[in-house]
Amino acid sequence: MRCLYRGALVSVVAIGLAGCGGEPRADVTGKVTYNGKPLAFGSVIMLKAGGPGEPTVAEIQPDGTYTFYGIPVGETRIGVVSSNPNFKLELRGDQKQPPPKADPKLWFPIPSKYSQPTDSGLRCSLSAGPNAHDIDLK
């Protein structure tokens, strides 16, 4: 009888653990361009459409590429901001300006309409695993 009880307990635990995989996740890579030129500065913001959740942010690299790891799958809204590297931070004491990640001369502004994922009109559909999504702003 003790063996039967242990077998039943092991089965219940195994079935319970089988459902603990969590929500499927996506990795996303791509390149951001504006009128065909890569953005050298800024961030890409992704927000799952139609559901609760926090936006995730990836930094744009000097060659215009970005990468997200482990974000929710499904229909996704996108925002893009291009931070001006020439902006001087207000510093205190002996603090120094951090060096830019790319030549500040490569920076150019983009329309502010792209900054909010909910209003930008930019979207993609993500599936579990690796995804590629280039963002071409006009």
Locate predicted features.
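Sec-dependent bacterial lipoprotein signal peptides
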Residues: M1-A18
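Bacterial signal peptide processing site
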Residues: C20-P24
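Structural motif
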Residues: T29-L39
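Short amphipathic beta-strand segments in non-cytosolic proteins
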Residues: G42-V57
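Short, surface-exposed beta-strand/beta-hairpin micro-motifs centered on an aromatic residue
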Residues: D63-Y69
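A short, solvent-exposed beta-strand micro-motif common in secreted/extracellular proteins
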Residues: G74-N84
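Short acidic/polar inter-strand loop motif in beta-rich domains
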Residues: N84-L91
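Extracellular beta-sheet/turn segments enriched in Thr/Pro/Gly and aliphatic residues
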Residues: Q97-K138
